[in-house]
């Protein structure tokens, strides 16, 4: 069977079909609500080296966990502001309007523009004057092809008003346009990255930008992990500085729901390299009950356990790390599932020959590019036991249709579970492209708009653009 290659693919754990595996699990202190033995263990026939570091039980739902209070510091949101706070006020809104354009400057995907609309409409409905700022691409100075001009028609259409555009970001001409702005009107500034001072977080530039407004709303989650002038710098000069609806939703799901999830809580982590997901895996091991690993990173885990991986992608300098992560999962009682079968290819190409083999039987000269059907079944069985799922990273080289089955199967499973009330969070990046490709994006509980910002938040890092905002009300929730 011909197949295509891409970064080595994900692997999934084999279904527990044997009483010899299941029996010990029943006495492992599993909590009510976990349905572990049948789906969370390796089959007795699986290579023992695949199972050696895997804890096949749901974590901490036993009496050992008990009741836990979780405190989170919320940020003040635009929804906390009333008409009395907003009417007649100049509001600087940092949005993420970094949309793709074709060679004719036509927008090819307006998702980020649509995501910014609720915050803008709320401000307009409360009589504010909105000054909208964003970046587009990575310009080196003023670069016409990175102008925000092509965004004006779509913004105007979605808002139902004529959006005006400035030819600059700061300066006398911009100040005049702001002064002439009526209540309920929108002015779009030019690409803020036309100024090198933006990414340097230059205080003087931030001060000039802030001087245009009375208060600040950050709704650009995709750049919240950067301390730039328009995300962090302006907060030193504008109060209040609050989160927009999109940014708040990202925090609610990627921080709130992940830190204090409905359990059992499963995390699916894919991607080509362990090195790019170390922080995410380590952070999620502190929080999740089940961790499913896929993508090319899996082969580093396999080689660390002494398995032959053929020509699959391996990070030789991360073998010890892979072993330690497996040991950490076992120590914390996290059910870490590895694929039991893999779809392999004889080259990294769409027209490659392919076949399905056990994860322990990858021949020389072949590379893994997707998880196999047994692995998909095992992953799906595990996900059936959960109440919260977060997914970051594809299961295989889904850019090639032949190796997209594993990734698309996971997307469809999450859509099915989301309809049943399971909280499903798509943590940015290629996972978003996957659910959009399958046509199930609208069904998910939350789809993150951030790439690097999503990863850093999942890693437990503080995001400068969020830290700089005004603090909201301390919330406290309890899980049992």
Curated annotation (Swiss-Prot):
Q: Which residues bind CDP?
A: 271, 295, 393, 398
Requisite cofactors: Mg(2+)
CDD domains attached to this UniProt entry: Phosphoglycerate_kinase (cd00318)
Residue ranges of the TM segments: none
> Which pathway is this protein assigned to?
Carbohydrate biosynthesis; Calvin cycle
Which PROSITE patterns does this UniProt record tie to the protein? Answer: PGLYCERATE_KINASE
DNA-binding as UniProt keyword: no
Highest taxon of the lineage: Eukaryota
One GO term describing the cellular component: chloroplast
- Presequence extent in this chain: 1-72
The UniProt keywords, alphabetically, are: ATP-binding, Calvin cycle, Chloroplast, Kinase, Magnesium, Metal-binding, Nucleotide-binding, Plastid, Transferase, Transit peptide
* Residues engaged in binding ADP: 271, 295, 398
Listed EC numbers: 2.7.2.3
Asked if the keyword Plastid belongs to this entry, the reply reads yes
Q: Where does Mg(2+) bind?
A: 430
Residues bound to (2R)-3-phosphoglycerate: 95-96, 98, 112, 134-135, 137-138, 193, 225-226
The listed locations are: Plastid, Chloroplast
Q: Matching Gene3D superfamilies, A to Z?
A: Phosphoglycerate kinase, N-terminal domain
Residues the record lists as binding AMP: 273, 277, 296, 368, 399
Record note on quaternary structure: Monomer.
Name the protein family: Belongs to the phosphoglycerate kinase family.
User: What's the name of the protein?
Assistant: Phosphoglycerate kinase, chloroplastic
Q: Which species expresses this protein natively?
A: Triticum aestivum
